[in-house]
Amino acid sequence: MLKKSIWILVSVTASISLSVVVGIINPSEKINALWLVVAAACFYVITYRFYASFIAAKVLTIDENRTTPAQKIFDGIDYHPTNRWILFGHHFAAIAGAGPLIGPMLAAQFGYLPGFLWILIGSALGGTVHDTVILFASVRRNGKSLAQIAGDEIGPVGGIAAAFAILFIIIVALAGLGLAVVNALSQSPWGTFTIALTIPIALFMGIYLYRIRPGKVAEMSAIGVILLLFAVFSGHYIPGSFLDPFFNLSKNSLVLSIAIYGFIASVLPVWLLLAPRDYLSTYMKIGTIFLLAVGVIMIAPTIQMPPVTRFAEGGGPIIPGRLFPFMFITIACGAISGFHSLISSGTTPKMLMNERDIPFIGFGAMLVEGFVAVMALIAATILIPGDYFAINSKLSFEALAAIGFPVERISELSEMVKTDVAGRPGGAVSLAVGMASIFSAIPGMKGLMPYWYNFALMFEALFILTTVDAGTRVARFLLQELGGKVYKPLSQTRWLPGNIGASLLVVSAWSYLIYSGNISSIWPMFGVANQLLAAVAFGVGTIVIVKSGKLKYAWVTFIPMVFMFATTLTASYQLIELFRDKASRARSVTDALTFKIDAFLVFFMATLAVIVLIDIAVKFFRYVSGRVEVIRKEIDFRG
């Protein structure tokens, strides 16, 4: 009875909070950011309690008695049984990158309401299912990648198209994520020093847990957190010191440094660097977001951005397209992310100890990421709209005033953080300003705005970099799988020359895109690539569910698949037209060629995705109509 009463109370609280947010209650008043925090927290708790249980028990039929690939194929490099909390930390750190931070910040152009509703509904009913179903499918198939699962489930044509699409998409995605790290750390010695220090700390944690004190997770965690806090606070003393020149890096130097790190993390055994660093980063990620939520609760800031702005109809100074479809591809990982399917069928299934942990890791980590996206949206929308646009666009103050968004406090904000923040597009700077505004408003924190601003930039880089290292490793898996069709030893992950060669090719590809691109070209391509991949993953998940004899539950992936294909193909068409228009108006031959290449890349990604979609549709109707015998591809490992 007590439990039932608690869930009723949580449901009522969620309903009231959502009513305030959407304007049913007090529609004429500006709302308090506290309502967004409460609504999201309650909605996500309810979703995890009921929808996650439904997916695990009815749709997937989790079996905790089955032996997982991590145990059966243990090799100490990629396949390695891992504690559920450490694996949650790795998985969350790997999936939670630039999307939930930068995406909502940029999408705030359309107002706070569309983005908030999409983050809430998209993550709870779409993103969670996407991640959980693909993780389950991979665990049941020896930890196979999404490309291999697609080949097994939908056939060779769709499988090959999916493999090339996924490889191409992940390279573009890694470039987008890497660019966000570069923008956050450029000329920031504090952040660069702290990020660099997490690498030896993670190596020590890995050796401590698996060699010095095997299985002592609590000890390792305590030591790691203490060392991480030292790295964070000691970084404050780097600017202006004799170490400043070593960590005050240009963008090109940062690209090279990140590429070297990504290569090393991709080749080393997963337990040595990747897993402990991701686990360590998760403490900082979740801890900072938790403190940000506490700050919002304590100071209760008012949302300054209108519910819906005039840019919803025809685009604005930050995002050139209208709300549909560009809001959905801009928010990306904050609601639904195809990149997650690469982690859910890459590193995570090879480290899972027990199937019962699948909902906790796949479903739970996505909900936490959704909450991160809500906090990023709040950080954007508590800024005065004119100041928000002044930071995130290159428009003059006069031009912003002419379109109805006068700049009010931009000079004051620049003085408070000791940095000129005007005309700094990309989302990283405005997010840091928003976070610093919340932290410095907490009692006792006044006057620490510059500290919190630099801390926020470091936090963003730490948040995003963990997806770059894990993504590079996953891309290496995929490239080795494809290469193995030509030269068989390449497909063996234990073969070091293959690991090194594939990692080098992957790192070279995404680092080149960062060198040659910018946020205005890479981020829209990243959004389209990411969401096209999500649509493909939903399609593969639908076939997996149908072939498992659960046709009546196929709607959990089929409905999101249809929506994501409709959204991303529309966005692809509009983005191609946008790049073609920019090419026709380019001031130089080089710029025109760049925009034409961008248009071709989007067309190529969309074409591959359509091929996969057609193959999925054909297979789906054949299975449903009974024309083809259903053959399950699961590997039965029972303990």
Could you say what each language-model-derived stretch is?
Residues 153-171, 364-371, 426, 445-456, ...:
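Loop-to-transmembrane helix boundary motifs in multi-pass membrane proteins
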Residues 296-312, 367-433, 470:
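Extracellular/periplasmic helix-exit of transmembrane alpha-helices
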Residues 43-52, 166, 171-173, 226-231, ...:
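Selective recognition of specific alpha-helical transmembrane segments in multi-pass small-molecule
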Residues 1-14, 46-101, 282, 321-322, ...:
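Membrane-interface "cap" regions at the ends of multi-pass membrane proteins
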Residues 21-27, 31-32, 78-141, 152-156, ...:
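Membrane-interface helix-loop-helix modules in multi-pass membrane proteins
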Residues 17-30, 99-101, 113, 171-187, ...:
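Transmembrane helix-loop junctions in multi-pass membrane proteins
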Residues 53-80, 106, 120, 129-158, ...:
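Flexible loop linkers connecting adjacent transmembrane helices
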Residues 29-49, 107-138, 147, 190-202, ...:
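Extracellular loop-to-transmembrane helix junctions
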